[in-house]
Amino acid sequence: MITRTLVLLATVATVAGAQSAPSATSQIRTNWKDMMANVTAAAEEVPDAIYAYKPTPEVRSFGAIMAHVAGSQRMFCAMALGDAPTAEDDIEKSATTKAAIVAALKASNDYCERAYAQSDAANAAMVDVFGTQRSRLFALMMNATHDAEHYGNVVTYMRLNRMVPPSSRPRP
């Protein structure tokens, strides 16, 4: 009887302590949301005059980087949703003011929310990513990685203009 009770208690404790692992998509979504919170905060906070700033003539301006992020997000998330992707540089060519760029960035975030809300099963489906069959999850990982790459540019541009980037500020 004692053995049965101990086995039962051990089983209950194991089941009670077990937690299901978060899905791959939800983990990538968390990473993407954190990154885009910083990118969007920077886009909103940087003054209009700095949107034209380029540290050297051959690189994108701050505004062009933000527009590029908005456009590329739209492209990657379209791939992940199975929609026809737009050209990566559509927004970069059409949005030229801070207001238009911030609006495009927020719209691309909203669009991407749908892609990151898909299940792991849905994100296992294969789609065309630059001419190669990859999973929808791969397209979402590419998006999050690409956003992080350009947030590095944003941090540098802000520092060169004596601004503190969102990710370097004390947390509340």
Where are these regions (language model features)?
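Sec-dependent N-terminal signal peptides
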Residues: 5-14
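Short, contiguous alpha-helical
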Residues: 29-33, 37-40, 48-90, 128-172
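N-terminal secretory signal peptides that target proteins for export/translocation
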Residues: 1-2
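Disorder-to-helix initiation segments
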Residues: 21-28
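Boundary at the C-terminal end of the N-terminal hydrophobic targeting segment
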Residues: 16-20
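Acidic/histidine-rich alpha-helical segments that form the ligand environment
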Residues: 42, 93-128, 134-146, 150
